[in-house]
Amino acid sequence: MPAKRQQQTIKRKTAGKKSSKKMNQQRSTLLISVHRTQAVFLLLLFAMIGVLMGIGVWKAGSAIFNYVDRTSRYDKMIVAAGRRNGVYPPLLKAVIWKESRFDASARGSKGEIGLMQVMPSSAVKDWENTFRRQVPSDGALMDPALNIEIGSWFLGRALERWKDYNDAEALALCEYNAGIQRAESWKPLLHDGKVMPNIDIESTRKYVRDILERRDEYEHEWNWEKLK
């Protein structure tokens, strides 16, 4: 091979190697850039997830705290009213739990108001006539102390009415939820008989069952006797 052609061949090979090396370097730089971008994206993603989880945990914790605070803030009122009106405090608290979930501003679809969802046309009116006192407005029934006082008095009167029955609490709850006429129709023939099989309204049967179960829970978990 002539010397000149040999030199040209060597130059082409050298140039090809340099070009290939340059392309490899560019490819490596591009890959590094892509990896860095992916790493930054993942870091940002994890950071966002962490923030969202933190917010979620905080909100959940806050909700739990608020609920626990709401379920216990009326304890002294419940115990005092229960003792005055002859209602076992765990039962009274269970009724409030069922009626309003401890929401003092709760309103029912039929005009029920407050913690114990008292009815202005029945419980409130009876209480006013008995004690010769006037509730100034429906809004006043959102006052926790007044609402619990009227509701516990109404429930206590029902308990007194059914005291000769073994299922006095269940009958009183039937009266509180569905009225005295229905409670009369559901009472057992014998004083030691059971009420639940006679209740033909599913919502009332569930109402009574839920409250009695919750009463049992409060009886064992709530240290109400020490409250004054």
PLM regions and their residue ranges:
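N-terminal Lys/Arg-rich, disordered targeting/topogenic segments
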Residues: 1-37, 187
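N-terminal export signals and maturation junctions of secreted/periplasmic proteins
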Residues: 25-80
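Catalytic glycan-binding domains that act on GlcNAc-containing polysaccharides
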Residues: 56-228
